[in-house]
C-alpha cells in the first residue's frame, strides 16, 4: 500500500483567497495527498492583510514574520516539524521569480521533500543505505570542474595516511555490470589500457583514471542522464556499492559524474566547484542543493584566465552562503607526470582550456625537465585531437596525456603506432586560499568526520 503524501502548500496574496481556497480543495479532490496546511510567502494586492489568509483559507496557515523576503527558513521548519513529503507551490509572479523558485526548491529538496509547481515536479536524490563502511561522496556542480582529479587525489591521500580506501565511480562510459579494477595489484600500462579499449570498453573512464592514479581497488559503474537535482535516469552504482562492501578496504569513496549525484548514502561529502563557472550555476538553480549535501567545498581553477580575484571572491562567498557553515578550500591544478620525463621531448594533450595551457607547459618544463614541442587542448574533441596529433607527433619522443575522454582510443593508440612512449599525467590540486593550507588536510578532516558519523 502506497503511503499518503503529506502536502504543504505555498500561497500568496496576489490571488483572491477564494481562488486559493478552491485550489487547495482540488488537491484533495485529485487525491494528491493529505494537505497539512499552507505557508503564506508574501504579496498583498488581493488581500486586506496577511492575517486574513489565516482566517479565511480554511486550512492551517503559517505566516512569515518578514514581508520583504521569501520565508525559506520557515518552509524548511514546517517541512521538518510536520513531516512533509511534498511542497506544492501555488504562488506566482510577482511574489516569486524563477530565481526565487529555485531557491525554494533547493531548500525543499535539501530538507528531503519534493517540490511541485503546476508544470514541474522535482524530487531529491534517493540515497540507498547499502554501504557497510565509513564513506564520503565527491560530487561536482558541473562538468569539467576537476572532480575526478580531486577524487583521485583524495584516494591517494587517504591511502597514504592509512585509511585503506576503495572508490566506487559512476560515469557515462562505465560498464554494463559494475567492474572491479584492482589498481593496487595490476600494472595499468598504455598497452594494457589500449587492449581494454579494443574490447569495447571506455578505458579512459573515470574508474580507470582513479585506478591508475590512486593505485587502489576501484569499482566502475555507469549512469545515463542527469536531472536538475542530480538524479540519474539509470545507474548500476547501487550494485557497485554493494560490491565495495566485499573489497579488502576500510573506507569507501563514492564519486559522482559531472553534476549527477550518486544515489548512495554516505557519511560525509565533498563538492567540487569551478571558479570559472557562471555564478548562477553555483548559487542559483539547484547548485545550493548540491552544496548543502556536503561538508567541504573545493573551489578549483582559482587563477586567471579562468577567474580573476573578484570572481573568485564572489564564488567563495556564494558557496559559503549556500553551504551554511561549509568549509572551503581555494585551489589550482598542476600537472604531474606519472613517470620520469626529464630530458624528453613531449607532446602534451589535455582537457584544460586553451587559455591556461601555456601555464601548464611552463610548469611541466620547469618542474619535470621535459621539453614540450606541441600541445592540444582537444582531448575531448576527437577530430581536432587527431589533427593536433598529426601536426606534432613526429617531433616528440613521448606523449603526455591526461587519462580521460579520447586519451586511450585516440591519443594512446596514435602515439604507440608512431613509436612514442606514453606517460599519463595527474592533475594535482594545490591550495591557494580558504580554510586550509593543504588540500590533503582538508579531505582527511572530512574522512575523520565520516568515520565519527559512521561509528556514532
Curated annotation (Swiss-Prot):
Keywords noted in UniProt: ATP-binding, Cytoplasm, Ligase, Nucleotide-binding
Compartment annotation: Cytoplasm
InterPro entries given in the database record: Cyc_diphosphoglycerate_synth (IPR016557), P-loop_NTPase (IPR027417)
Catalytic activity of the protein: (2R)-2,3-bisphosphoglycerate + ATP + H(+) = cyclic (2R)-2,3-bisphosphoglycerate + ADP + phosphate
Keyword Iron-sulfur part of the UniProt annotation: no
GO CC annotations on file: cytoplasm
Gene Ontology biological process terms in this record: gluconeogenesis
Protein EC: 6.5.1.9
GO molecular function, one term: ATP binding
Biological function: Catalyzes the formation of cyclic 2,3-diphosphoglycerate (cDPG) by formation of an intramolecular phosphoanhydride bond at the expense of ATP.
Family, per entry: Belongs to the cyclic 2,3-diphosphoglycerate synthetase family.
Protein name per UniProt: Cyclic 2,3-diphosphoglycerate synthetase
Taxonomic path: Archaea, Methanobacteriati, Methanobacteriota, Methanomada group, Methanopyri
